[in-house]
Design a protein with these regions (language model features):
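Intrinsically disordered, low-complexity terminal regulatory regions
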Residues: 1-81, 85-89, 97-215
């Protein structure tokens, strides 16, 4: 499975960008993924319905992800709860080839991974399924992954119940990206070093303009 290289701006959802920005602030300290206990984004409780927490077992040839907790919206999309279940068993053999490699990429690279796929609800309406994966370390190895899932339908309403199991139509991948560029969070309104800034005199006198660079 191929992944493009992307900057944080690839993430569309404002809520997911907030989650990613909190992760980036922690990452920027030492250029490594943070520990999960450090991760305390604002309004986390509001997002819990759309989050899945995974623990990562690395004793097998490929990482094994197990679900200790999940949001209720996500369990409705898959048609069952996943608490205590491995990712492979949770999504099932039909969806595993489309889903599991995305998580493995996140674990292997210890970087955020973002994906978008079109799926059909039980009435045939096209729904964009946007998934953001955030890795967390313990003793230098990825031990946890948080998945944030957002759904969007251009036609308006859709049926989330059994969204990932409603019919035989498989997800149609639109984007798979490893977020490995611009791994920092720039606060709104801040000017980055080396950005050119122009200063002009006020009207009423001969107008001159000076351009400087911030270093």
């Amino acid at each position: 499975m191929d992944f493009t290289s992307a900057a944080p701006s690839v993430v569309k959802s404002i809520r997911q960008r907030d989650l990613l920005n909190t992760w980036l602030r922690l990452y920027a300290r030492q250029q490594i993924a943070p520990a999960i206990w450090e991760y305390q984004p604002a309004r986390l409780e509001e997002e819990l319905l759309d989050l899945i927490y995974f623990t990562v077992e690395l004793s097998t040839p490929t990482p094994r992800l197990v679900i200790p907790s999940e949001g209720t919206r996500i369990s409705r999309a898959y048609g069952h709860t996943g608490k205590g279940v491995s990712l492979d068993d949770y999504v099932g053999p039909r969806l595993a080839p489309y889903v599991v490699p995305i998580y493995h990429e996140c674990v292997t690279r210890a970087l955020p991974v973002y994906s978008v796929a079109d799926v059909e609800d039980i009435y045939g309406r096209i729904v964009a399924y946007e998934r953001l994966l955030l890795p967390f370390l313990t003793d230098g190895r990825v031990s946890h992954v948080i998945a944030s899932v957002k759904t969007f339908c251009e036609d308006g309403g859709f049926e989330i119940r059994n969204l990932m199991r409603g019919n035989d139509a498989l997800p149609r991948p639109k984007l798979r990206a490893a977020i490995d560029r611009e791994l920092f969070h720039r606060a709104p309104g801040r000017i980055a070093p080396a950005d050119p800034v122009e200063f002009s005199e006020q009207p009423g006198s001969a107008i001159t303009t000076e351009t400087i660079e911030l270093n």
